[in-house]
Amino acid sequence: MKKKQPLPRIGFLGTGWIGRHRLKAILESREAEVACIADVCRENASDAAKLAPGALVVDSLDALLELGLDAVVIATPSAGHCSQAVRALEAGLSVFCQKPLGRSAYEAQMVVNSARAANRLLGVDFSYRFTDAVQKMHQLVSSGELGEVYAADLVFHNAYGPDKAWFYDAELSGGGCLMDLGSHLVDLALWFFDYPQVRSVSSSIFSGGQRLKGGSGKVEDYAVVSLVLENGHAVRVACSWNVSAGRDAVIESSFYGTQGGVAFRNVQGSFYDFVAEHFRGTSAETIATPPDDWGGRCAVDWVRQLRTGGGSYNPQAENLVQVAAVLDAAYGR
């Protein structure tokens, strides 16, 4: 009888709301053992420990790295992502990080270089890829059923803004709504088009209704970005915080081909419920509807790769740098 392989032992660095959500999803998947919780906030650590009572609770990355773990999930403020991920990778741990991987393409490249050098698995929580709606859209695009897909429109308007002060400090966050929300949209667009070269990037970025210039030090609350891809195909991205959207959020993505189109949109302003449709001329076929418990799937996919692949480097991590480079270009840096 074949001996059962032990589950990967992982730690969590940062256990705020999103960290605890991903922790719960990984526990429920039974793909890994949560062996350590690290958070400087005792309340967050205590709440996380209730989900994983067998995990050791520590207060620093240093302490976590001493435990001989296989991997770490990083869910800390953005300013720490690059340095924390690099330290973990150099210590031999695989890494799953909240987006953004870095505040710039330079930081993202540093992390990817470290993952490659250490031969460790690197993932980033671009979670919208794993909604049922987006998965079914991607299948249609990849199948060729839509013909040549030549244009895409992607939108994420949030009627609220982040509740943490660091989001509004460009040095700490790397940017405003474009970094926070637009990164998801740029990731989706490049993924759907299979990571082509980007010929040009133009943008209009605002704060409080005033156009921002590069290097202003302010973070934006509204951004529109246009991409022209190597084959001339066009992508438009728009995102915002605190916009008068008439609902909690407007989240939509549409892809148009020579033989049809696909789109997904949120339902009644929800941040979590989506429908997707397949367009043929003036007809629309619904291909995905709620409910769909998708929030932790990206993390579970990463931990499954960790378990089955031994945590080795996946070259798809190189694509994370392209997402960051597009954001850099949109910011004019």
For the regions a language model picked out, list residue spans one by one.
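Contiguous beta-strand/loop segments that form the cofactor/metal-binding neighborhood of enzyme cores
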Residues: 187-269, 299-311, 328-329
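Active-site loop of classical SDR/Rossmann-like NAD(P)-dependent oxidoreductases
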Residues: 40-43, 289-300, 315
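Hydrophobic residues in well-ordered beta-strands that form the structural core
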Residues: 74, 97, 122-124, 264
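N-terminal Rossmann-like dinucleotide-binding module
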Residues: 1-52
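Predominantly a Rossmann-like dinucleotide-binding segment in NAD(P)-dependent oxidoreductases
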Residues: 128-216
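Rossmann-fold dehydrogenase core element
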Residues: 108-128, 147-154
